[in-house]
Amino acid sequence: MSVFALVDCENFYASCERIFRPDLKYKPIVVLSSNDGCVIARSKEAKQLGIQMGVPWFKTKKNFLKNGGVFFSSNFALYGDISNRVMNILAGMANNIEIYSVDEAFLDLENMNLENSDVADEFAMHCRSLIKQWVGIPVRIGIAPTKTLTKVASYLAKEQTKRPGIFSISNNWMEIASSLKKVPLHEVWGVGRRLSKKLSVLGLRTAYDLACIDISLIRSRYSVVLERTVRELRGETCLQLDKSLDPKKQIVVSLSLIHISEPTRPY
């Protein structure tokens, strides 16, 4: 049975800046575009202040600084280096890895038994601990039988209090359905706000609503891409990892400040 994990670095650019400024742990942080024109990244605390992505810096600067916020000009060389370190750790923890973006990667965990949630949770906690200890970046991890469901799991991991930052979904439909009911339609991977508005005319509001719709209706009115999304939400694996590149070739090699030995796989 296919099992995937999505590892998502939390508030990545802001978290990178915090590595070198631990005194800013609970401070609002924003990272600005290359010319300091607009906000391109926010810490959780900055989000709580209502700072929006893409807002012109001159419009929010005064209020942000008044609330004790700290801003940084973007440093993409730094972010790329930190990303490389995270991806190197992940490459040693799975059979295959697909680097999806600078702060996200899918892992192939085909040997994991998802029916035992403790196994998935222990792997996720081990992974989070290694990355936090060796690199200093907090990550969120979703584990599920399809890539689309890992996105759902990652979304739900944000709200976890018992085991913060991790969430797993088994191949049991009742468990899948329970998870999907908590996710707004626009949060489904590949749907977004524009398509969710079009789908709302069909009465769809949540990921669960989309998973329950007639496949033939989706195929005739929309696209094969959305059909795959529906099937994946039901637990049917349609999307595999992109293995066009060897994992080691996906990672831009850079000089490391720390020596990374191959992590053990706790499953």
Regions found by a protein language model. Name each.
Residues E187, L195-S261, R265:
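DNA-contacting surface of Y-family translesion DNA polymerases
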Residues M1-V102, F106, L233:
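Residues that scaffold, gate, or flank divalent-cation-dependent active/transport sites
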Residues L107-R128, G203:
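Catalytic palm subdomain of template-directed nucleic-acid polymerases
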Residues C16-R18, A41-K44, L149-A157, S223, ...:
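Short acidic, glycine/serine/threonine-rich loops at helix termini
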Residues R85, I89-M93, H126-V135, K198, ...:
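Generic non-transmembrane alpha-helical segments
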Residues F123-V183:
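Long, highly charged, low-complexity intrinsically disordered interaction regions
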Residues V102-D108, P145-T150:
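Short, conserved phosphate-binding/catalytic loop or strand-edge motifs used
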